Amino acid sequence: MKTVFYESRIAKLFTFISGFKTIMLFGLIFTEHQSLSKTVLAHEKVHQQQYQDCFGAGLALAIIIMFTLFAFSIQSLWMLLLVLLPIFLYYIVYGTEYLISFVYRSFKHKHLVMANDSAYCSSAMEMEAYDLQEEWRKPCKDRRIHHSFEWFKYYGVI
């Protein structure tokens, strides 16, 4: 399945504010460029794998919640919202982490642009992606790869 879309209008729509030209949305990579460097592609593929991790965790969580509610005979239409949990869990985690970091850093830096840049760079998911994006240059036996939820280890580094 095609996962990278070049010269994408979707990328232009979502990246016009940030200054970036490539974005990963719902497990697909969209870019304004005609081609991507291996470094940028590796960075975005780490985000793809993080999205897949969160999707699987969200699916498991939604199933557990659904069976628990059925066990107690609690059923209503709002349970259909649980279908959205796997799809949006990555963005919920990423956004929550970013907002907490941004608020903290806006008090620390007193300058919103610096707080924004600092909050973005100190995101655990971004830290893992930046850490692994150069691994493609190493010989195969020396490469580190993404492991499920390995980005949790970056919470102690922030």
Language-model features: locations:
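Metalloprotease/metallohydrolase-associated module, dominated by Zn2+-dependent proteases
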Residues: 2-12, 58-158
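Surface-exposed beta-strand edges and their flanking turn/coil or helix-capping segments
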Residues: 19, 44-45, 63-66
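Catalytic Zn2+-binding segment of zinc metalloproteases
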Residues: 45-61
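Residue-identity detector for glutamine
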Residues: 34, 48-52, 75, 133
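Generic hydrophobic/packing signal
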Residues: 20-22, 46, 133
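Short pre-active-site segment immediately N-terminal to the catalytic Zn-binding motif
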Residues: 16-42, 52
